[in-house]
Every structure is written in C-alpha cells, then in structure tokens.
Regions:
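Bacterial extracytoplasmic/cell-wall-associated proteins, especially those involved in peptidoglycan
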Residues: 8, 14-177
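Sec-dependent signal peptide recognition
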Residues: 1-9
Length: 177
C-alpha cells in the first residue's frame, strides 16, 4: 500500500490516538524524537515517527508514557556517584548506556539539546497539537511499532511485518502471520 492510499484511508477513517491526560514533559519528548529522527522530512515522516511512539504507548509490551518510550533503554550509574556508597538514591545520577536505546539519538553520547531552535520550536508546537488533539492525527504507519533508516538492515527486521516506507524510514509491526 502506498502513502497516498494510506493517507486517503486515514482521512476516511481517522485513527484516533488516545491521549487522555498529557504529562508535562510528553510534548517535549515527542518533539525531541521528531527533531532527531525526522526533522528534515515532511509531515508524513514526522507523523510516522510520532505514530510509532504513540503506538508503543498504547501497546502493553512497551512503557505507557511518551517520555518512557522515547527514553527506553538500559542505564548505568555515573562513576561520580557510584564511588560514594552512602549517597542517597535521590542524589545518584544515571545515564543511558551508549548505543543501546530504542531511539539511537537518545544514547549516542551527544548533546540532546537541539541546535536549530526555530525548527525545534516548530516541532514542539506540532507535538503539542498532536498530544492535545488540536489536529487530526492519522497513523500513516498502519500500527507500526518499529522503524529503521533505509540504509541499514537490522537483524530484527526479518522477524517483523513491514507496513510502509516513508521517505528514508521503513516501518514495521509485530508479525501477525
């Protein structure tokens, strides 16, 4: 199924992503994910990347908040706090383990502060519109929970069902065969 057919189907039968109460950081987490995963893409690419996050929030196999989905991955304690045995748990610092997160930008060791403030603000406004149901959000991925760039072939891809290709990403869901 091509993108035009999916968008048309979505307009006819809009898939509503349930976002009853929006936690404070949810729009920021979604905007950061759009920024680092699809900022140079058009609306379809931004919606597709966002749909994967929101589909995961609504799937019991993943964390149930936007930020927990975006930040999902193993963590380790900082060497600075690990050396102090009597330090309270609230004062300990934890960081994601490099290159082991669900979304690579979150644990690539680089700053997560967007350089292009104007673009980030546009994406933050879009994510707020999505989260607060101010715009009609169509899941153009047909329920995808996974994606990767089209220039890589991860081992997990052959165990999933491909749903669509949008710009430079390929989207998948659990294999239902």
């Amino acid at each position: 199924m091509n993108l035009a057919a999916i968008v048309l189907a979505g307009v006819v039968s809009t898939v509503a992503i349930q976002t009853q109460q929006v936690p404070d950081r949810a729009p920021e987490c979604l905007a950061l994910n759009m920024y680092y995963e699809a900022r140079s893409q058009g609306t379809a690419g931004l919606f597709a990347v966002s749909a994967v996050v929101l589909n995961r929030v609504n799937d019991s196999r993943f964390p149930n908040s936007v930020c927990e989905v975006v930040e999902q991955g193993p963590i380790r304690e900082s060497w600075k706090t690990r050396q102090h045995k009597n330090l309270s748990s609230s004062k300990r610092k934890y960081y994601p383990i490099k290159n082991r997160c669900q979304f690579s930008w979150y644990c690539d060791g680089k700053s997560d502060v967007p350089r292009n403030k104007k673009k980030y603000q546009e994406l933050l406004d879009l994510s707020k519109s999505i989260m607060y149901n101010e715009i009609s959000f169509v899941d153009v991925t047909d329920g995808a929970l996974f994606y990767h760039a089209d220039y890589v072939t991860p081992g997990w891809a052959k165990t999933k069902q491909k749903t669509i290709e949008i710009q430079d990403h390929i989207f998948y869901r659990w294999n239902t065969k």
